[in-house]
Amino acid sequence: KIIELLRKNETTATFFMVGEILEQEPQILDIILENGHEIAFHTMTHSNLNELTKEKFLKELDTFADITNGESKGFRAPTFSLNKNTAWVIDALLEKKYVYDSSVVPVKTQLYGFSNCELEPFKISNKSLTQNNPNGKLLEFPLMIGKFFGKTMPTGGGFYVRFLPLKTSLKSISNFEKNNNPATIYV
């Protein structure tokens, strides 16, 4: 249904996919790519990055590359688990020639996120997860945020998109687009 909705609206999307799903249902990859969409990595089993080592993550990147014929250039951490303890992921992504990440939530929540973070795409590094690093080689697309009753929160997906009124998410999309930023939405 998502593919059909995107086709109807003449737009494309990036699908951050868990590798084991593509192993079990390889036709999903074909459908995504045949319709002009992008495939990106979301780990092999939806593991929190804190549960992985760099070596295990590198193996997962290789496995995903085999499954997708090297189509993936982007990554999003499950449960937005990129943090100072898992910053090694940035180097692993660069080692495997990834171009971008979209794991940073630019507002602190009880579960994840960062305060004092860039809102626009920026160059991320393992030493700077929240601010542009001119020497960084990986582009970060932070998650979309917005205000609800004066409180800043993620508005692009998950619990928040189910909890917040639709107009709150639509306003966030509009605000991001006014600043020429991509509205990073997840379902």
Where are these regions (language model features)?
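N-terminal regions that are enriched for targeting/export leaders
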Residues: 1-4
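Metal-dependent polysaccharide deacetylase catalytic core of the NodB/CE4 family, i.e.
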Residues: 9-88, 98-99, 103-111, 115, ...
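Active-site-adjacent pocket scaffolds in enzyme catalytic domains
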Residues: 77-181, 185
